Amino acid sequence: MRKINFSAGPSTLPLEILEQAQKELCDYQGRGYSIMEISHRTKVFEEVHFGAQEKAKKLYGLNDDYEVLFLQGGASLQFAMIPMNLSLNGVCEYANTGVWTKKAIKEAQILGVNVKTVASSEESNFNHIPRVEFSDNADYAYICSNNTIYGTQYQNYPKTKAPLIVDASSDFFSRKVDFSNIALFYGGVQKNAGISGLSCIFIRKDMLERSKNKQIPSMLNYLTHAENQSLFNTPPTFAIYMFNLEMDWLLNQGELDKVHEKNSQKAAMLYECIDLSNGFYKGHADKKDRSLMNVSFNIAKNKDLEPLFVKEAEEAGMIGLKGHRILGGIRASIYNALNLDQVKTLCEFMKEFQGKYA
């Protein structure tokens, strides 16, 4: 019997995708070989590769103004590649909403970029999204869409004349996005759209001009990968294959509005369970900034019960509920692949646990 996986990433995958990958693992589409065994230069793999890119653009409703790049190194490599490629001679502005923005800021500073933190919620342990106003003339404005550890999420992205950079690693393909002022939108795909080893970057083509005359190693230059259709070097072929299956699965769910609707229902159920617990459970994030993807909470009346909660949840068939080591507590990551019944099972367990130990 499969466990219900609330892990923050790598995370649960739709069973249909796992079964299809299992079916095709040794014999891809009856060809007598695995997709993992063939060259990335073959027509067979290129159909998967380019098909995945087109499906990703289709889900977000993007036209040819955007390039889709498949890169390695995780979202963490983008913390360096973004300032390396996109900084000019001005100021690069960041909104600091958690560990991942702090790391992005640090990488930019290491590169000697003029970095300005224009807003931060660190003083309250990142429990909310701060009000942010970016300068119109900044080289770029940087945010993290969803903060996996703390369970906060931008409900709407800031409006800015500066090119907006969005780390969407933990809410990738979970809702529709207005790309009207987004210059670069990226994430590792291992939470909501595949397995680890692949990052997907949507970059507006005019931004590639910024890399043109810079002395950047080829592998770290966005232009290199755009000009070579993300095939400059051997890509993570199996991760791209899995991403392609995820794109098919998401398209079969309907538009991202439909995906968002399901995610909203799951989150509402879980937050209601917390809010109606008479203070037994307490969420970390301010209600107005609550994430639909990561629900971080404590057993407020007795934090010593939290390890027992995780243990008993595992015995009941639910894994991945231990909070991040930085924040502690409990965290339920309820990404696209989790269904409403699975979240309902967690809520029922939470009520039973409260009944036993309150």
From Swiss-Prot:
Which residues does the record give as L-glutamate binding sites? 41
Q: Required cofactors, per record?
A: pyridoxal 5'-phosphate
Q: Where in the cell is it found?
A: Cytoplasm
Q: At what positions is N6-(pyridoxal phosphate)lysine found?
A: 191
Residues involved in pyridoxal 5'-phosphate binding: 75-76, 100, 148, 167, 190, 233-234
Q: Name one GO cellular component term.
A: cytoplasm
> Which GO terms of the molecular function aspect are on file?
O-phospho-L-serine:2-oxoglutarate aminotransferase activity; pyridoxal phosphate binding
Q: Which reaction does it catalyse?
A: O-phospho-L-serine + 2-oxoglutarate = 3-phosphooxypyruvate + L-glutamate; 4-(phosphooxy)-L-threonine + 2-oxoglutarate = (R)-3-hydroxy-2-oxo-4-phosphooxybutanoate + L-glutamate
Q: Name the UniProt key words of this record, in alphabetical order.
A: Amino-acid biosynthesis, Aminotransferase, Cytoplasm, Pyridoxal phosphate, Pyridoxine biosynthesis, Serine biosynthesis, Transferase
- Quote the record's cofactor note: Binds 1 pyridoxal phosphate per subunit.
InterPro entries (UniProt xref): Aminotrans_V_dom, Pser_aminoTfrase, PyrdxlP-dep_Trfase, PyrdxlP-dep_Trfase_major, PyrdxlP-dep_Trfase_small
EC numbers: 2.6.1.52
Cysteines engaged in disulfide bonds, as pairs: none
The record ties this protein, via CDD domains, to: PSAT_like
Q: Name one GO biological process term.
A: pyridoxine biosynthetic process
Metabolic or biological pathway, per its Swiss-Prot or TrEMBL entry: Amino-acid biosynthesis; L-serine biosynthesis; L-serine from 3-phospho-D-glycerate: step 2/3; Cofactor biosynthesis; pyridoxine 5'-phosphate biosynthesis; pyridoxine 5'-phosphate from D-erythrose 4-phosphate: step 3/5
- Protein function: Catalyzes the reversible conversion of 3-phosphohydroxypyruvate to phosphoserine and of 3-hydroxy-2-oxo-4-phosphonooxybutanoate to phosphohydroxythreonine.
Entry's family note: Belongs to the class-V pyridoxal-phosphate-dependent aminotransferase family. SerC subfamily.
Q: How does this chain assemble?
A: Homodimer.
Which protein is depicted?
A: Phosphoserine aminotransferase
Q: Which organism is it from?
A: Campylobacter jejuni subsp. jejuni serotype O:6 (strain 81116 / NCTC 11828)
Please name the taxonomic classification of the source: Bacteria, Pseudomonadati, Campylobacterota, Epsilonproteobacteria, Campylobacterales
